[in-house]
Every structure is written in structure tokens, then in C-alpha cells.
Amino acid sequence: MTLEEARKRVNELRDLIRYHNYRYYVLADPEISDAEYDRLLRELKELEERFPELKSPDSPTEQVGARPLEATFRPVRHPTRMYSLDNAFNFDELKAFEERIERALGREGPFAYTVEHKVDGLSVNLYYEDGVLVYGATRGDGEVGEEVTQNLLTIPTIPRRLKGVPERLEVRGEVYMPVEAFLRLNEELEERGERIFKNPRNAAAGSLRQKDPRITAKRGLRATFYALGLGLEEVEREGVATQFALLHWLKEKGFPVEHGYARAVGAEGVEAVYQDWLKKRRALPFEADGVVVKLDELALWRELGYTARAPRFAIAYKFPAEEKETRLLDVVFQVGRTGRVTPVGILEPVFLEGSEVSRVTLHNESYIEELDIRIGDWVLVHKAGGVIPEVLRVLKERRTGEERPIRWPETCPECGHRLLKEGKVHRCPNPLCPAKRFEAIRHFASRKAMDIQGLGEKLIERLLEKGLVKDVADLYRLRKEDLVGLERMGEKSAQNLLRQIEESKRRGLERLLYALGLPGVGEVLARNLAARFGNMDRLLEASLEELLEVEEVGELTARAILETLKDPAFRDLVRRLKEAGVEMEAKEKGGEALKGLTFVITGELSRPREEVKALLRRLGAKVTDSVSRKTSYLVVGENPGSKLEKARALGVPTLTEEELYRLLEARTGKKAEELV
């Protein structure tokens, strides 16, 4: 490559990277994946190293992020600069990082490092004076960010006041959206036909930039902190000499600190931690796109200093990009339990994150228009939140002209009824649509709803075909003679199913509300509604104002719930369920026997896991999905997963199922059978 060719390519890359910086940092709406962005930055960096005369202080390789050009929040200048991190993509590059440290310090390693998960969120800076939070701001370009104090304060774990800290203090961290909250939010947005978020990082950024803090508060944001700006030297003088100790100091001061950090010696030690965490990546409750490796000894940080863009004492060791190219072969349309029609893309099968992917949701009309996706397109796919296959972007440069636009059906693909269009959402209004009935019963019987074991998809189809059930209330009218004789259904199987159906009557209001599929009502909201109203009769008479008082309920959701509660067909369904003996009262709270305790469950229990979780919550405990230092007990069933290993590493006490029930008996004076 000649100098002129290099100059032309460097200018192209700089313009392209600046554009994508603006999309990512300012609009929180990136058009390319992190892996593609890293490739562009890497190409630019290599060209600048090969042709030093092309280096420039305004190059993206010398800068962090993008200045908030059209900020909707007040710009604030950080007292000390917030840097980005350089990246390593393989062990050789990690080793090269250690060798640079050795040369700069004039001595051989190995050195001690602190290794932390690189939480994929939005970097923030909290500024305190005399222990009082003055403001919180986004990173922006590293020198100027946007003040987002009110929105940050909707995260309950962020301290407003501190004791025993330097007079002026900056605390740095990451605001993120847990995967579970991200999936729930996208489900709600999709249901309303609104634009969904591409990943948890975008969802966190978009939520933190809301003008109304009440919206931010309902998004389930979390924060983790890991560094100091102003005030670090004073803290060092107090005896905090390492990054590992600094993380402990932050925890002692009340800041949430991501629990999975570790010490390692030398590049080989870091590699061992990296490989271990890479395997466990999808067990994390948040998205992590790598690990952050920092020299542990803080005194060495000052010796090494910074480049224009990043510290020399730290590096981001990125996980491999889990994205694949494939073709969209066709689009089919599915009808859900609410009648909403969802397009599903049929892909040339690809292997992604341990499983074959051949279908991908295309969500709604807004999503298809935004992507400009067509049948025959080459697409880049990944798993959103590490769970759901999703199209990341369309590879338009590979179009041949033979691609076809996606046409929405005018009639229901299941029953032929003419579809209604509500904004960008297409719905089948036919109450007798077989697809709506099937999905409603399948959801009602699912594990987190009424948990009717043995009522699988094939059996639901047969019950509908034979006219034995038309809706969920009909399940409670089934008799043994109705079931015996159905394909693969003998007398014993029929008895077992009827026993499961009978037991489901006692699940309580919380599970019933989730099972009935009220609009926008997931597990958390069902729990909140049950706690607020106590029984179905009171909920049926709720006003809009009363619904808006419920935690996690916004105005759109409240109006949709109210419309359903007033619907005569819904009220008739509730009446028939009540006549069948389905309990419609919230489960008795059970006092505060376990208040202040946090439980996590792993492995198979003798009782349904959701039943045990509900019992623990009724007794005042908190039940989470991941083990941390805040976990009081890990309940261990048969065939436990990686949570057991993590609990042992953190020193978290474990209980067998039998030991758990003994603990409950000691705390409540009742046996487990009496409590369930």
C-alpha cells in the first residue's frame, strides 16, 4: 500500500468511526456490532502505526467516545478525565500487553493483576463533595458528559451520602440492564408494536437518557462500580494499595461491586481466569463482552500513566464475537395468545453459541422497516441477551437484486379472519381462533404459571381438536373418561394429569394473574398486583389511578389491564374458574420469618422450583437467579449447576432441600407441608 492509498483509507476509517461513535455514545443506537467496530478501529490503528506521518491528535484512536453534540441533558466537565481501554483479542495480544509493562517499568514479570468482568453497559461518573452526591454523569467523550443525576438515583443501590471519604471524590462504574429485565422490556415494547432495543447495553443507555425518571425507574437498571478518579491518592494514603483492595473499599462504602472479580499472576494466570469465565459467560445475569485486566498495584499506575486514549496499566480482553452470517430463506407468520401476529424468519441453519439456529423472530412491522430486511437477504445473527436468536443487521452490500420485500398477510394465517391493524401491530380479532386458544392454554399450563405437568403441546392440540376444551376454564371440567383413549393417554396418565390440574387450583393469585396473560403482566408485575389488591374481586374493581400506584405499572400498561378487566368475556372466564375452585386470593404472607435473607436455588427439587420460590418470598425472603456475596443460602437439589461451584468459591452457605425445610420449621414453627 502506498502512502497516498493509506492516507485515503485512514481518512475513510476516521470518518466512519466518528459516525459510529456518534451513533453509539450520543444516540445509543449503533448500526454495527461491537466486533465490527473493533475491526475498524484496529485497521485504523495498524495503518497509523505503519505510516506514523498519518497520525493525528484528533484521530479516533486518540480519543474516547463522542461529545454529546446535541445533548438533551446538561453537559458537565469531569474533574478528571475518563479514559477508554485498549483491547486484546487473543492470548498473544495479552502477552504483548504484559511485555509492554515490563519494558516500561524496566523489570521482568510476572505481575499481579485484578481481573473483572467487562460489564456491557454505560460508563458513569458520580461526583461527591463532603460525602454528598452532587451529580452523576455519563462518560461522553471522556472530558465532557451529560448529567443524569435524577435518573441514576432511580437505581436504589447508588449511595447519596458517604462517610469517611475524601472531601472531593469521583466514583466510576457501569450502569447496565440485567438480561432478564432486557428480555421483559423488549417483550412489552414488541407487544405494543414499538421499536425494540438491540441489546441490553442499548436498553440501559436509552433508559438512562429518559426525560422522565419515572420511566427509568421502571426499567430495572443496575449499577456496578470499580474505579476512582478524584480522591484516589487520598484513599491510597489510607492504606488501599491495590485494585483488589479498592474494590473491597468501594463495597465497604456502600457501592454495588460486581462479585466476580479475581486475582491472577502473569498473563498465564489471567488466561486461566478468562477461559473459565468464558465458559460460564451465559450463566451471568448481565451481558459481559470480555474481562478487564488491571495491574493490581496502584503505585505502578502512576509510573505507567496513560496514552491519549487509554491507561497503559489496564486492557480489555474481549470474548470472541458470537455472530454468524446466514441467509433469510422465508418468513412465516405466527399467532400468539393475544392474537398478535408475529413474523418469524426461516434461516439457513447456522451453529451459534452451542445450538443450531434456523428460525429468528422479526418482532413486528417497525422492526422490519427499520432493518429494511427482505427475503433472500444475507444477515448477521446473534443471540440477544445470550438467549434469543436475533438479526443484528442486514448485509446490504451482498444484495443481488433478487431479494423480495416481506408482505404482511391480510387474513389470519390460522383461522382466515381478516386482521386488524393497531399502529404497527397486526392482530386477529377472532375469539375462536385456534392459534389464540392453543397459545392461551399452553401459557396457562406453563411452569411459571399454573404448572400443570403433563399438559404438553401435543395433548393441548388433541383436546382442542376433539372439542374437549375451548379455553383454560374447561381444563377444570375434564374427566378421566374424556382423556382415556386419546393418543398415548392411558388410565394412569389420565389420573396423573387430573391430579396435576387439581393441584394447580392452589397456586394462588400471583401465579393465576401471570397465567391469564393480562397485557404487559409478567412474573414481577403479577406479584405486585397480587400484593396490592390481595384478591381477584378487588382487582376486578380497580380504577386506573389504583393500577398506576402499583410498582412497575406505567400508564399504557394500566390502561390495557383495565380494558381487559372490564371485558365481559374475561369476567366470564374468571367466574368459571372460580366456580371450578381455582383459588383467587393472594397467598398468605407468612410474616417476616425469612426477612433479610437472600436465597438462590440450583438443581432439581422434589417440589416444583417455582412453588419453593413462592414459599420463600411469602416468608419475606428475596429469591434471585445468581450467586453473589450477598446470597445468604444456596439451596442445592439433584444435579446442581455451576452455581454450586461459585457458592463454594465465595464462601456462601449451602442447604439441601431437607435442610431448607428444617430451617423453615425452626423459623415458623410449621412443617413445609403446612406452609405450601
Swiss-Prot record:
SUPFAM superfamilies: BRCT domain, DNA ligase/mRNA capping enzyme, catalytic domain, Nucleic acid-binding proteins, RuvA domain 2-like. One of its GO terms (biological process) is DNA repair. The active site is at residue 118. It comes from the Bacteria. DNA ligase that catalyzes the formation of phosphodiester linkages between 5'-phosphoryl and 3'-hydroxyl groups in double-stranded DNA using NAD as a coenzyme and as the energy source for the reaction. It is essential for DNA replication and repair of damaged DNA. Belongs to the NAD-dependent DNA ligase family. LigA subfamily. This is DNA ligase. It comes from Thermus thermophilus (strain ATCC BAA-163 / DSM 7039 / HB27). The gene is ligA.
